[in-house]
Amino acid sequence: DGGSALGGDADMTWDKTNNTITLGGTDTEAVIKGVTNEPSAPSSGNLTLYTKDMGGKMTARVKGPSGAAFPLQDALWQGSQYVWTTTGATAGLWTNTVGAGAGTFTAQTSVSTSPYTAMKRSRWANVVTTTNQVLGQRNTDATFYVGTNGGFFYAARFGFDVWTNGGRLCACMHTATTVVSSNPSTIANTVGFIIDAADNGLISFSTRDGTTLNKTSTGLTAVTGKGYEVQMFIPPGGSTIAWSILDMNAGTVASGSTSSNLPVAGTFMTAGVLASNAALTPVTSIQLGVSKIYVQTDN
């Protein structure tokens, strides 16, 4: 017939003639449970809508017949978005904030060898002899914090055109402009993905308050020619931060959450993806590539 009740309730009807589902009643809503496994690509002419936990943030996603999936962007007029993108110059382009690049900059030539090498990115490398150089990109306007009215969603895509064990990494929120001039795990009020000089490239998720460190291995390791997509999320007033990291080349994902030793509430931090050659003195011992940094807040 032209219309019928679904689930025995007239508030949800299916109009077979017009192929329309109607949610009636008062204060209607549709709740979609987040997937554990990515759905298959739909057939030609169709689009799959679903939800997924991305770094602790439940996100609406769509997938087309090509198999490519992407999240739906929140309204730009609500909350705040802070974005860095590569432009072919060391500064790149920050939106809604200001920032700075550091290290010997070169524009990349994309090649199709892997998802990382095909990615448009800026690159920064160390010069010869000088130790503990800061390489990469960060915003310089301390804007982000945990606690009441704080919280943030952070995402970044980066990797290494050259990685040598003994280097450092901090894809993170931090208060110190020299967060990788020493081991990032020693810097107060820092949260994110780090490598200390003695870690031999092992990437950890780290939180540190004013004094105490909490450091958890992701199981993924920095390798020359490999890229990573990282995310972390803590809601306003939240006491737990969730995280995820994707090995872009292998497709391997690690995730977790922690409530231990978060940065001191109300301490303003900056966002960045930074690396250092630490004690490595040969030129280009470390060459960091960064494609994008994205931070979203509710205020």
What is each residue range found by the language model?
Residues 1-80, 87-90, 100-102, 130, ...:
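Extracellular repetitive beta-rich solenoid segments
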Residues 73-163, 237-238, 297-299:
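Low-complexity, Ser/Thr/Pro/Gly-rich disordered linker/stalk regions
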Residues 154-156, 225-236, 241-245:
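Short tryptophan-centered beta-strand motifs in secreted/extracellular beta-sheet-rich domains
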Residues 156-158, 171-173, 293:
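Short hydrophobic/aromatic patches on beta-strands that form ligand-binding or substrate-lining surfaces
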Residues 164-175, 241:
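Beta-strand acidic-aromatic groove motif in beta-rich domains, primarily in extracellular
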Residues 254, 285-299:
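Extracellular polysaccharide-targeting segments
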Residues 257-289:
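Flexible glycan-contacting loops in extracellular carbohydrate-active proteins
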